[in-house]
Amino acid sequence: MTRIHPTAIVEPGAQIDESVEIGPYAIVGPHVTIGARTTIGSHSVIEGHTTLGEDNRIGHYASVGGRPQDMKYKDEPTKLVIGNRNTIREFTTIHTGTVQDVGVTTLGDDNWIMAYVHIGHDCRVGNNVILSSNAQMAGHVEIGDYAIIGGMSGVHQFVRIGAHSMLGGASALVQDVPPFVIAAGNKAEPHGINVEGLRRRGFSPDAISALRSAYRLLYKNGLSLEEAKVQLRELAVAGGEGDAAVTAFVEFIDASQRGIIR
């Protein structure tokens, strides 16, 4: 049976699983879908065309599915889609997409979103991502699986942050961070491969060694970006356990529109 506090407002049209719990003074809009065993904290607002999957935990005073902070937005029925088993803590704001992009903001599964985080319109957050308190994502930001964003960091619009990377606290990021790389500073600069994170996630010593070699080619050998990419492509077909990881590294760089941190 759905447990809805008597002071909460659930507008007609909302689709709420019978196992959902909604706390005091929370508001759920008419175009919202909430999956099984999800809990909505007190005073939270879930609005817009928002879909929440199963087993999510929304903290007190969170604002989920709000209008994009984009002056071009004209009340189009854009969306926010959130997967399963996400923790979204107090005072977090997550906005719907815009028609200037694909019209949807997405958050995958098993993410840990700490207090006061902002996820802007059209962002695409993968799985198992950690966004530390007060991390701020502008519109159209992409964050790969297992990335970690330090507290008080700011990420410029359209920036891409690769899988398994890490952005240090209080950083200002204006260009893309390749996968597996640690970045920090204002403005953020590269500081090596995220070795500890890769070990925790089961990457083999050979794969980590290959990524370290890739990092040296890109950042330490005095090569231009185009020269480095030629050698990185050769490294990616060396026949070792690190080929797949190095290939992902190179493909991310090739796809960059804003340029990578250097």
Swiss-Prot record:
GO terms for cellular component: cytoplasm; membrane. Its EC number is 2.3.1.129. The gene is lpxA. This is Acyl-[acyl-carrier-protein]--UDP-N-acetylglucosamine O-acyltransferase. It comes from the Bacteria. One of its GO terms (molecular function) is acyl-[acyl-carrier-protein]-UDP-N-acetylglucosamine O-acyltransferase activity. It catalyses: a (3R)-hydroxyacyl-[ACP] + UDP-N-acetyl-alpha-D-glucosamine = a UDP-3-O-[(3R)-3-hydroxyacyl]-N-acetyl-alpha-D-glucosamine + holo-[ACP]. SUPFAM superfamilies: Trimeric LpxA-like enzymes. Involved in the biosynthesis of lipid A, a phosphorylated glycolipid that anchors the lipopolysaccharide to the outer membrane of the cell. Pfam families: Acetyltransf_11 (PF13720), Hexapep (PF00132). The keyword Transmembrane helix does not apply. It is found in: Cytoplasm. Keywords: Acyltransferase, Cytoplasm, Lipid A biosynthesis, Lipid biosynthesis, Lipid metabolism, Repeat, Transferase. Transmembrane segments: none annotated. Pathway: Glycolipid biosynthesis; lipid IV(A) biosynthesis; lipid IV(A) from (3R)-3-hydroxytetradecanoyl-[acyl-carrier-protein] and UDP-N-acetyl-alpha-D-glucosamine: step 1/6. The keyword Cytoplasm applies. Gene3D superfamilies: Hexapeptide repeat proteins, Udp N-acetylglucosamine O-acyltransferase, C-terminal domain. One of its GO terms (biological process) is lipid A biosynthetic process.
